[in-house]
Amino acid sequence: MKLDFHTHGKLAKRLPFSTVYTDWLFGEAKNAGLDALCLTEHFNTLQFDELYGYLSTRSTREGDALVLENGLRVFPGMETDIAEGGHILSIGPLEAILELNQRLAPHKAPGNFLPFAQLRDLFDQYPVVVGGAHPYREGGHIPQLPREQLARLDFLDLNGKDLATNRQQAEQRT
């Protein structure tokens, strides 16, 4: 299975949700040969619920996946900022992601982000896998987290954007 673990369904988190863009994006993903993707939209994006509501109406449910008309499997997820600096991915059942997003409402603005340990404690209450998003990108501090906290991650995301913009640096850091 060809799977992208870190995909956004919106062009930018401050822009309104666009069904046209999202449909185009998922069509391009399928045309590029992907079988599935994890939709890890920013937790504080505009219209987070609307994006997932739209996908729910345009897909059939198979386990935790939303299967689109073109056959692309979409695994619901979210990208969450942490107080230390950096982003954490969570992927799981749609209901879990939507509930987590609601529970994080008080922590969506800079200055209110949860520290990683508290965020992970929250995620531990749900059937989600949790990973560090693009940990070596400028401004992120995931590699500086204490070793016992790093051990709580299920995976690390090596983002293609990092390879495209500075492959040598990305390879050295990983």
Q: How should each PLM-predicted stretch be described?
A:
Residues 47-157, 162:
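Extended substrate/RNA-proximal surfaces in nucleic-acid metabolism proteins
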Residues 58, 161-174:
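Conserved beta-sheet core of the metallophosphoesterase superfamily
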Residues 23-25, 117, 141-145, 169-172:
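A generic local structural motif
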Residues 29, 120-124, 174:
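N-terminal cationic-hydrophobic initiation segments that often serve targeting/anchoring roles
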